[in-house]
Amino acid sequence: MPLVNAKDMMQKAMEGHYAVGAFNINNLEWTKAILQTAQELKSPVMLGVSEGANKYMTGYNVVADMVKAMIKSMNITVPVALHLDHGTYEGAQKALLAGYSSVMFDGSHYPLEENLAKTRDIVAKAHFLGATVEAEVGTIGGEEDGVIGRGEVADPEECYTLKGTGIDMLAAGIGNIHGKYPANWQGLDFDALKKIKARVGDIPLVLHGGTGIPEDMIKKAISLGVCKINVNTECQLYFQEATRKYIEAGKDLEGKGFDPRKLLAPGTDAIKEIVKIKMEMFGSVGKAE
């Protein structure tokens, strides 16, 4: 099945009251694990790629070609969107030209008018190519590829204004952060989410920083209009822990345990484990049947 944009999967998620997971990929193993899990669980999925990960994997074209080829060779039949995560103005255009089916243009650090102008331009180019666009209001806290945000709560009026640019998905800050949540985190601001949803209407909402948010908060956010949830750090932590245990147990010194395919297997299996947990939590299992 070829790549799809996020429009149809977001619409179905909104109507079905579930969310689609957007899981960041960092290499072939990451991609393989997420695609396998989505196929096994019959779940739609979005593969998120940060600009840093694109650079690590040597470029947008390499990532797009790899994902497309893997979908074909693995006989993946569930809907898969390849999505640029927190893209710059320049990065979003590069991703679109490389064949990404969805992009996030993060202009939240620009003055509002400049953000709106740049967003309109990205929307026009993306829609011409059949791709979808996500935009953000209210900086998400934590760190994302070296960019540190303060975890602002989005202004409903700014959300409404940004919706007017023609975007397909809206990421609105509601106290969520990237990375690990600190012990003193106050939780998601559901009052703010309700106000945003009331103002923007039927546009699918996006929750960034899905790592470590309690299940009850996740489910409540979905009930209030969240249709896409980003997960990155949690996959990294599961991968790291499984790989560390393999090495600490001396498995890499047994036979050909040093073979990269064996060395990376426990971490890859761990990614599948957490992706399954998240897909079940988000309610997307079986929604691609």
Where are these regions (language model features)?
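Generic N-terminal amphipathic, Lys/Arg-enriched alpha-helix
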Residues: 4-21, 257-259
